[in-house]
Amino acid sequence: MEAKAQARFVRVTPQKARRVVDTIRGKGAAEAVAVLSFAPQAAAETVRKVVESAVANARVKADTASVRFDPADLVIAEAYVDEGPTLKRFRPRAQGRANQVLKRTSHITVIVAERQKEGAR
């Protein structure tokens, strides 16, 4: 069983968010939440919320299908960050000039799936 969660238009740069997402890819869902809870990066909180949402979505999906659900069996199957729209702002500089400031946004996607059994193919 697979479940997906997204956070769109998050005000964190995709480059910084990808650093966080790369640390949890392939880990168990519970382990990923634990790692993100103590990560110093600002994007870690948003990514943690997306992982928790994906686990909750998996629970709802299992309940709807009347299937046994164990959150310990969930693993981060896919996690990626896409670039969202960029907000363009201007900062006043000397001599009447202005520099452009790019405020980047991200779309964070996490897909959790059940861990493959050892004997299964």
Curated annotation (Swiss-Prot):
Keyword Glycosyltransferase: no
Top-level taxon of origin: Bacteria
Keywords: Ribonucleoprotein, Ribosomal protein, RNA-binding, rRNA-binding
GO CC terms of this entry: cytosolic large ribosomal subunit
First and last residue of the signal peptide: none
GO terms assigned for molecular function: rRNA binding; structural constituent of ribosome
Stretches that traverse the bilayer: none
GO biological process: translation
Keyword Ribonucleoprotein: yes
Stored HAMAP family: Ribosomal_uL22_B
Subunit structure: Part of the 50S ribosomal subunit.
General function of this protein: This protein binds specifically to 23S rRNA; its binding is stimulated by other ribosomal proteins, e.g. L4, L17, and L20. It is important during the early stages of 50S assembly. It makes multiple contacts with different domains of the 23S rRNA in the assembled 50S subunit and ribosome. The globular domain of the protein is located near the polypeptide exit tunnel on the outside of the subunit, while an extended beta-hairpin is found that lines the wall of the exit tunnel in the center of the 70S ribosome.
Entry similarity comment: Belongs to the universal ribosomal protein uL22 family.
Protein name per Swiss-Prot or TrEMBL: Large ribosomal subunit protein uL22
Gene coding for it: rplV
